[in-house]
Amino acid sequence: MKTFFHIILSPLRWLAQLLGLLRTLLVNLILIFFLAALFMLTFSNDKVTVRDNTVLVLTLSGQIVEEQKIADPLTGALNSLGRISRLADETLLQDVVDGIRAGAADPRISCLLLDLKDLDQAGLDQLQIIARELLKFRSSGKKVIAAEDYYRQHSYYLAAHADEVYLNPMGLVDLHGFGIYRLHFKEALERLGVNYHIFRVGDYKSAVEPFSRDSVSDQTREQNRTLVHDLWQLYTDDISRERGLQPRTLELYTNHVVAQLAAAGGDPATLAWQTGLIDGLKTRQEISEYLITLSSPDTEQDFSQISLADYLRSDSIPYPEKKRKDSIAIIIAEGPILGGYQPSGAIGADSIGEQIKKARLDPDVKGLVLRINSGGGSAFASELIRQELLTFKKSGKPLVVSMGSVAASGGYWIATPADEIWAAPATLTGSIGIFAAIPTFEESLARLGVYNDGVGSTALSGSTDLTRPINPQLAQALQLTLERGYRRFLEVVAAGRGLEMSQVSQAAEGRVFTAAQARDLGLVDKIGHLDEAVAAAASRAGLTDYSVQTITRSDSMVNSILEMLRENGARMLISQSGWARLQEILSPFKQSLTGLALFDDPQRLYARSELILESR
């Protein structure tokens, strides 16, 4: 018998020893990892020296964001060190602004070179902010030069604001217009046996259409056509002004490309030059030789240059700005609105609530600018944030909202308490409406021969079980709650904006508006960017001499170390075009399905707008 048990237990003992060995190895690897991180933290912050007559290379990579995500710092750090990710997943907008401004005032910087080949995504509002800084840089008497193998839409917008724009002789300028396209899953869900129960208020509330339709509704099509037309007009007007083009030039270039290309002998680069989109055709070597004439040669074959990342670590950047006794605080609200504490890249009701409270209790903070770039999310979380902002206002400090590319639905809900709302020229806002969505999988399971049955103590027992058909009483209760939530949304807007309910109703039903339309409807006060909103807050606070500080969320030291590793590792990477292409292909699926993971509202009510503008 002992021999029998020995035979049975021996593999288990061996397995336990193996697990213990693996656990010890893992602990040691983590220890080495953190020691390396501490070493990098200690020695990687040395100031970079800038040589005289140096070209500042403004490299924009990944997505332009206003708050960098640290949602999974360990993965980010390992990806960067393992050369899995791109050169950088994100570029912080404020870093770009700081770098350009410092370069304009730095006598050692001779000119600025735009490096846009790895720029994946940016809102038109963000592009406009960077473009304004480029124009200010040019006004200092220094050149801005753009030179690429090819230009996509968002990268060309910035290039058009340069003094000189060059293109590789084998390149092209890809301008094709804006669009709003979404995948629709109704037929797929039916084939899978998934029953999606949709509840919504507002004919224009289109966030759930992909799960209930196979095509865009007439109302949504009408609305989106107006939005893309107005934003494209804004885009083309800016480019035509900076490039000195006739208004019809870009219309011919995009809508009659076949005839235009045929006239240019089928050569896209020649077409771009003949149209006036670029100033000349130059190879990479010719660009390098040209830049040597504008700077000190670093070697016989290259020019003296410094990257934006290194320049931000140099002694030229007065960053962060020294806090004065009187300051205007900025809080970034970017991403989906969710309950609880959320990492950077999402707006958590509790996490941003702490930031607002910090601004309220700080005696040196005399005013607050809430920078919103969000399509909304949980209605309950949005209301919690609004309540915290109302508490802030009781302190007597002014509250100003600055809207980014999108401030819609729940993003507009949290803007309503503001004393003053500024929307950027390219802002999309409104979408006053709410919805609820509950999928059930009883048919999916039945096809597999799996059924759910039993008894409950009340009529609502088991009503939240997604493997059962939706309870009729739950559906009716949810619709009543939804209608009450919609009325509450209208009341919040009316109270915050000083409008009659009839006026709000005309701007509701889930409609989305451009900044100009929203201003005409009384939903926003003025059109301008973040700088103007900060100045407005200072004016309301009676300040003329003040500093600006950004109140960030409190991250743990572990997260900070891991994020530092990610940033330092990213600088060692080369662009992974294959990986980037895969991400681009999967992007529509990610954008369409991400919303499913964000449904965390306790009442299942969502004030969210799915505005995905295809602008690349």
What feature does the model see in each segment?
Residues 1-87, 94-97, 169-170, 179-269, ...:
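Intrinsically disordered, low-complexity segments enriched in small/flexible residues
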Residues 51, 161-163, 192, 276, ...:
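Short, structured coil segments at secondary-structure junctions
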Residues 54-182, 319-444:
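Cleft-lining beta-strand/loop regions that shape enzyme active-site pockets
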Residues 143-144, 275-278, 521-524:
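Short active-site oxyanion
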Residues 150, 256-267, 406-408, 510-511:
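Short helix-initiation/N-cap motifs at beta->coil->alpha
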Residues 166-167, 278-284, 423, 524-530:
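Short acidic-hydrophobic, aromatic-tinged amphipathic segments that line or gate anion-handling sites
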Residues 343-598, 605, 612-616:
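C-terminal structured domain segments across diverse proteins
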